[in-house]
């Protein structure tokens, strides 16, 4: 495994490449709201060691990517983040497999309906408008005129860090960043529309038993929506990527990819 971070038009990308080249499609990982590529590092290491070429991008205004002007950022839709995905995919030059988490799962769906992808993996993902949207009561109303700041730690722990120990939860909470209020509304209030007939690739959906943000029942609906294979993870919450036992999720994804003959 080799690590090689780079930038594409202000988009910071973490690249983990395998020791030996293969003909497999690259894996492009898309993080969720308020997060960054750091959230994928366990998976980047796991899959690159298994022979996959892995890229984890950062949306604009997230982690080490460049920041857009305030007015532009607060009005950004999740659909707009397909811009970052497209630029990274173009720089790779190969049709990828897209793996998205949470709000990044909606970004992945938006991208897949406008650009060709080999496969789509949706991990505790935001669901399309066609399936309704779980209304999450936040501690304070969303102010559309300013960036949305991560909620207080105890509330964030209930949403993001179920089944995560206190020390790890605080470490990850410290890495959270501001989000576009428009994107947050799309995720927890009214959703974005998806034309599933425009997504012509195999889809895997992963849901978690304890997830309050993207409830497991919603993940089952999402799998049915796409006629996709569904993986149910017991004893875990919304954050499946860094919690103890994350390997179970990575292995399920890898096994599914092999079933698709990748």
Residue ranges, per PLM feature:
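Short beta-strand/loop motif that positions the catalytic acidic residue
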Residues: 199, 205-207
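Conserved loop-alpha-helix segment in the C-terminal half of the alpha/beta-hydrolase fold
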Residues: 207-236
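Serine-hydrolase catalytic-loop signature spanning alpha/beta hydrolases and amidase-signature enzymes
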Residues: 34-42, 54
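Active-site glycine-rich loops that stabilize anionic/oxyanionic intermediates
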Residues: 32-35, 209
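Conserved alpha/beta-hydrolase
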Residues: 44-69
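Flexible "cap/lid" loop of the alpha/beta hydrolase fold
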Residues: 113-147, 186-190
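Active-site loop/oxyanion-hole signature of alpha/beta-hydrolase fold enzymes
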Residues: 62-96
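Catalytic active-site module of serine/aspartate enzymes centered on a nucleophile-bearing elbow/loop
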Residues: 231-262
